[in-house]
């Protein structure tokens, strides 16, 4: 397993009126953060808040290229970012405690924190398509370059983990500094992760380590036909 210390490139916040960052996503231009009863759009260049959507935003956030998805208690809300309207709701599995949320290859991936699980869900019905066991609390989920990553946070220890999307085996780990937690995880599609900072009210940008092309190909996990 590859292991490294996190390279924090920069951080934003705390933001006015924001006491906790619950989830993070990126729409290609703006970083969206879930802050309780609002979704705030942040300029990743300046860190300025550009706009807000009044919607329950209690945990993970995702973007499918057109719509935002936001965890609110026992459901996922599908939101039109242009109008701010909730246009559909998707039931979550029983159990509660959901955290990270990601969109990949036509399906939703949701973390269940204290149960240490990641679910792949049908975005129309909420049906569970796959369950992955984790060894740590799951506090954020993202996909990039065919790789499944999730955040963890227990006590003062937090890290980012690349895992096999079928077995949950940890393939790579990026350790955050002591006391710096991750609550929400998103990739920019390149070499950067956006990490929510929980009660710090901050968003941090962490560099995704580069790997040799041969090593990278050998250790990547890709989605199977069920998620395409």
Task: Tell where the protein language model's regions lie, with residue ranges.
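Blade/loop signatures of beta-propeller domains
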Residues: 1-7
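A short beta-strand motif characteristic of beta-propeller blades
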Residues: 7-15, 48-53, 85-91, 127-132, ...
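Beta-rich, blade/repeat-based domains predominating
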Residues: 15-28, 55-65, 93-105, 135-146, ...
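Conserved beta-strand positions in repeat-built beta-propeller and related beta-rich domains
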Residues: 31-37, 70-74, 110-115, 150-155, ...
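Beta-propeller domains
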Residues: 36-44
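WD40 beta-propeller blade core
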Residues: 40-41, 77, 119, 161, ...
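Short loop/turn segments that connect beta-strands within beta-propeller blades
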Residues: 43-47, 80-84, 122-126, 164-168, ...
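Blade-level signature of beta-propeller repeat domains, shared across WD40, Kelch, NHL, RCC1
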Residues: 182-228
């Amino acid at each position: 397993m590859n292991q490294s210390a996190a390279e924090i490139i920069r951080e934003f916040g705390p933001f006015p009126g924001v006491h906790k960052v619950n989830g993070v996503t990126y729409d290609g231009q703006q970083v969206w953060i879930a802050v309780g009863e609002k979704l705030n759009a942040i300029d990743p260049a300046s860190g300025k808040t550009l706009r807000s959507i009044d919607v329950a935003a209690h945990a993970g956030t995702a973007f499918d290229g057109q719509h935002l998805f936001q965890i609110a208690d026992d459901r996922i809300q599908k939101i039109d970012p242009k109008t701010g309207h909730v246009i559909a709701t998707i039931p979550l599995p029983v159990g509660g405690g959901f955290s990270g949320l990601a969109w990949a290859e036509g399906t939703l991936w949701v973390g269940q924190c204290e149960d240490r699980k990641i679910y792949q869900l049908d975005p129309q019905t909420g049906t569970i398509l796959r369950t992955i066991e984790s060894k740590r609390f799951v506090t954020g989920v993202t996909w990039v370059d065919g790789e499944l990553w999730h955040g963890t946070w227990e006590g003062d220890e937090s890290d980012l983990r690349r895992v096999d999307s079928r077995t949950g085996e940890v393939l790579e780990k990026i350790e955050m500094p002591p006391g710096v937690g991750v609550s929400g995880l998103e990739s920019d599609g390149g070499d950067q992760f956006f990490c929510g900072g929980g009660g710090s009210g901050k968003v941090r940008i962490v560099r995704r380590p580069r790997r040799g092309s041969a090593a990278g190909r050998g250790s990547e996990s890709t989605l199977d036909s069920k998620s395409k």
